[in-house]
Each structure stands twice: as structure tokens, then as C-alpha cells.
Amino acid sequence: RRSFIKGAAAAGAASIFCHSPDRAHGYQSPNDRPVFATIGLRNQGWAITSKSFKFADFAALADVDSNVLGANVEKTEKTQKKKPDSYKDYRKVLDRKDIDAVMIATPDHWHTKIAVEAMLAGKDVYCEKPLTLTIAEGKLIERIVKQTGRVFQVGTMQRSESGKRFLQAI
């Protein structure tokens, strides 16, 4: 069951590049794979990152905990055979022009701030739930998505998967 949930999260993250035909078909060559970064690497952050290596290259990882960051940099390097850059300050990730998208799995109260800054920096975003803590934050996200035209995906597994709905029905 855990594997399924992690796989569903990775599929959700992958779907941020299937929003429009040019993106869905734009990454055909191994030389033209999307470049990702993950911000927040504990538990769910690493789970979605580790399931995403098959469709993206990770150029950077960010986490405020040096121990968590170091361990995940090592695991990423072993998996993709290239060491990602590491940052304690997520803003350094957003400053990079080579990163196409970020996956955000920080504590909940950081989600909106980082997601907005990422879109304004020209990044597509996959963000774990809950996306926002207030209605005003939700409206801000909506406005920034429309303003920037960025692709935005929220991880909603366990809330929308068919197995969950089936269990609720019985």
C-alpha cells in the first residue's frame, strides 16, 4: 500500500509536464530530460523524489537540516550517477535558470510562499498537500498560476484515488 501511494505521488509529479502537448512531447530525448529540484526532503519529500528519477534529472536538493540534506544528496548521486547541488536556502534553487520544476515537500506553512516564489522565478511546481492554510493563500496561488502560466500540480493521493472512494462507500 505504501509503495502504491509513493508511486501515485510520483505519477502526480510527472503529470506536471503533461499539461500541454508541447511539454508532453517536449522531453523525448534523454538529452532533453526535465531538470528538477526538491525543496524539503524528509519523508514525503524523499519518497516523491526517489520515485521521479525515471523521468527527470535532479540538479539540486534543498533542506534546512544538514543531515537530511547530506543523506539525500548521497542517495541521489548513487541513483542518477551525478551529484546534485545542495542548498539549505531554497531561494538559491529558485535563482537557478537550469531548473525547470520544483517539488515542494516542506512543512505545510511554507508551501504557499515557496510555490509562489517558484512560479515567479519561472518554475513549474508540484506541491504536497495541504497547499494552503487559508482561503487568501488559495486565491493568491490561483492568481499567480494565471499570471505566470506555470504548470501547477498538488499531491492529493489518499484524497482522490479510487480505492479510497471505494472504502468510503462500503
Put a short name on every predicted segment.
Residues 74-80, 144:
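Short, conserved SAM-binding/catalytic segment
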Residues 16-50, 54:
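C-terminal segment of N-terminal export signals and the immediately downstream linker at the start
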Residues 58-75:
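NAD(P)-binding Rossmann-fold cofactor-contacting core
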Residues 107-108, 112-160:
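Beta-strand-loop-alpha-helix segment that lines the small-molecule cofactor/substrate pocket
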Residues 161-170:
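Oxidoreductase and adenylate-handling cofactor-binding alpha/beta cores
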Residues 83-104:
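A structured beta-alpha segment of the ubiquitous adenosine-cofactor-binding alpha/beta core
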Residues 1-11:
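N-terminal secretory signal peptides and thylakoid transit peptides that target proteins
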